[in-house]
A protein has these predicted regions:
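Short, compositionally biased P/S/T/A/G/V-rich stretches that sit at domain boundaries
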Residues: 22-52, 57, 62, 133-134
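Solvent-exposed loop/turn segments flanking beta-strands in beta-repeat/beta-sandwich domains
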Residues: 61-74
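C-terminal motif of bacterial Sec signal peptides marking the signal peptidase cleavage site
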Residues: 17-20
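Aromatic sugar-binding surface patches on proteins
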Residues: 86-95
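Short, solvent-exposed loop/turn segments at the edges of extracellular beta-sandwich modules
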Residues: 114-119
């Protein structure tokens, strides 16, 4: 009886792991839409209370005009910053200069505001971990 329980339990765990790794197909972007993909913190280490740059990679249908990027920790109000530049090379990204934050790990979420059909729209939200040293 115990071996059957363990077999069923291990099968359930394997199924849970397999389903959590499954990718969800992305819907195609509508004309003028922007979808954030990932972030990259620049530099070899972030020091407490020192500004730092973040690249935000995205995909877009057309040539979007990104107004600003907004960052927040869960439960806090977003702080929005102007986009420094947009790169349209093999990887599409824009860069934002962020002010210094306190020492420790931070789970930061980000979205961007962009112009589509003459209106300001918000992208999807992506999250990243930022570890700030002394």
């Amino acid at each position: 009886m115990r071996s059957i329980f363990i077999t069923v339990l291990l099968g359930g765990v394997a199924l849970l792991i397999a389903s959590s790794c499954a990718t969800v197909p992305k819907e195609p972007l509508a004309s003028g839409e922007v979808r954030l993909l990932s972030t990259e913190v620049l530099g070899s280490g972030i020091r407490a209370n020192s500004s730092f740059a973040v690249n935000i990679f995205f995909e877009a249908a057309g040539n979007p005009r990104i107004k600003r990027a907004c960052f927040y920790e869960p439960g806090e109000e977003p702080s929005c910053f102007n986009v420094s530049y947009v790169t349209l090379g093999t990887k599409i990204a824009f860069q934002v200069q962020l002010p210094g934050i306190n020492t420790g790990p931070h789970r930061v979420e980000c979205y961007a505001e962009y112009i589509r059909d003459g209106e300001t729209r918000k992208t999807n939200v992506i999250a990243t971990q930022i570890l700030v040293g002394y």
